[in-house]
């Protein structure tokens, strides 16, 4: 019975790939509408619930974000659009100076 099964070959160790380091002068990515909402409301949630953990704060913020109507989300969406335009213009300038 042992003769019919092949002996296991030792596996070759996987090579670790190293990530390329980010350029510290590269422009920061634009924030999403949710991130603008979370940054604005995080302290409010913490003051209302002083005993919750970091993860629970995020969960509460997520629930509040889902409960917002499209009209209530609009100010955050417009901030996200403006930040996206800022990022794109900074990225174009950055790429032009790199090339």
UniProtKB/Swiss-Prot annotation:
Record keywords, A-Z: Chromosome, DNA damage, DNA repair, DNA-binding, Nucleus, Transcription, Transcription regulation
Family matches, as Gene3D superfamilies: High mobility group box domain (1.10.30.10)
Coiled coil residues, start to end: none
Residues within the DNA-binding region(s): 27-95
Basic and acidic residues bias (residue ranges): 1-12, 69-93
Biased composition (Basic residues): 13-22
Superkingdom per UniProt: Eukaryota
Localization per Swiss-Prot or TrEMBL: Nucleus; Chromosome
GO molecular function, one term: DNA binding, bending
Stretches for region Disordered: 1-31, 69-99
Gene Ontology CC, one term: chromosome
Example of a GO biological process term: DNA repair
Chief location category: nucleus
UniProt-listed InterPro entries: HMG_box_dom (IPR009071), HMG_box_dom_sf (IPR036910), HMGB (IPR050342)
Similarity section: Belongs to the NHP6 family.
Free-text function comment from the UniProt entry: DNA-binding protein that induces severe bending of DNA. Required for DNA-binding by the FACT complex, a general chromatin factor that acts to reorganize nucleosomes. The FACT complex is involved in multiple processes that require DNA as a template such as mRNA elongation, DNA replication and DNA repair. Also augments the fidelity of transcription by RNA polymerase III independently of any role in the FACT complex. Required for transcriptional initiation fidelity of some but not all tRNA genes. Seems to be functionally redundant with NHP6A.
Subunit structure: Weakly associates with the stable SPT16-POB3 heterodimer to form the FACT (yFACT or SNP) complex, which is associated with nucleosomes. Multiple molecules of NHP6 (NHP6A and/or NHP6B) are required to recruit the SPT16-POB3 heterodimer to DNA.
Remarks, miscellaneous: Present with 4590 molecules/cell in log phase SD medium.
Protein name: Non-histone chromosomal protein 6B
């Amino acid at each position: 019975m042992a003769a019919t099964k092949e002996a296991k070959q030792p596996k070759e160790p996987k090579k670790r790939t190293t990530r390329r380091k980010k350029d510290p002068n590269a422009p920061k990515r634009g924030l999403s509408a949710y991130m603008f909402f979370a940054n604005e409301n995080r302290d409010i949630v913490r003051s209302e619930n002083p005993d919750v953990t970091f993860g629970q704060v995020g969960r509460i913020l997520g629930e509040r974000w889902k409960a917002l109507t499209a009209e209530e989300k609009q100010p955050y969406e417009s901030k996200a659009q403006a930040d996206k335009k800022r990022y794109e213009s900074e990225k174009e300038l950055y790429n032009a100076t790199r090339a």
